[in-house]
């Protein structure tokens, strides 16, 4: 099974368990917080991701963490499953996929907007309203910065890419000019 399918299977399983108790948002908050703890703490990350560390030691660590932060049973069992199957390294990907499932269940589209510089709140709101009007759907906008696009914005959602950047325009012009033969 390829990695993307594996990630999706784990995320769907966690999401379906959360749906049973109608606690999808709570589980997302919890799994995101735990992922942040693991990501931000080098020692914890190395311990949980290491193939050398005994699985029983990892199980004990997850159980101890669960007790200390009052982790829900669903999330605790999920993390134990990842540990037992040596899949803790894909937790961040699972969290991202779970987030996508959560927004999809609420009919909210995740849209990534890339700009060359940090956008002001008014600009972000204007872009969000335009995108929601175009898609006729609520959105969750993730704003990223990539100075290589020079100026403008790039909008990505699903498999769509709308490039309104200076870099994109220059690449289109370059491509067109390469096709044109100069008459002598």
From Swiss-Prot:
A single GO cellular-component term on record: proton-transporting ATP synthase complex
Location within or outside the cell: Cell inner membrane
Family listed: Belongs to the ATPase delta chain family.
UniProt source species: Rickettsia akari (strain Hartford)
Protein name: ATP synthase subunit delta
PANTHER family for the chain: ATP SYNTHASE DELTA CHAIN (PTHR11910)
UniProt entry keywords in alphabetical sequence: ATP synthesis, Cell inner membrane, Cell membrane, CF(1), Hydrogen ion transport, Ion transport, Membrane, Transport
Taxonomic placement: Bacteria, Pseudomonadati, Pseudomonadota, Alphaproteobacteria, Rickettsiales
Database matches in InterPro entries: ATP_synth_OSCP/delta_N_sf, ATPase_OSCP/dsu
Pfam families cross-referenced by the UniProt entry: OSCP (PF00213)
Role of this protein: F(1)F(0) ATP synthase produces ATP from ADP in the presence of a proton or sodium gradient. F-type ATPases consist of two structural domains, F(1) containing the extramembraneous catalytic core and F(0) containing the membrane proton channel, linked together by a central stalk and a peripheral stalk. During catalysis, ATP synthesis in the catalytic domain of F(1) is coupled via a rotary mechanism of the central stalk subunits to proton translocation.
Topology with respect to the bilayer: Peripheral membrane protein
Binding partners and assembly: F-type ATPases have 2 components, F(1) - the catalytic core - and F(0) - the membrane proton channel. F(1) has five subunits: alpha(3), beta(3), gamma(1), delta(1), epsilon(1). F(0) has three main subunits: a(1), b(2) and c(10-14). The alpha and beta chains form an alternating ring which encloses part of the gamma chain. F(1) is attached to F(0) by a central stalk formed by the gamma and epsilon chains, while a peripheral stalk is formed by the delta and b chains.
Gene Ontology molecular function: proton-transporting ATP synthase activity, rotational mechanism
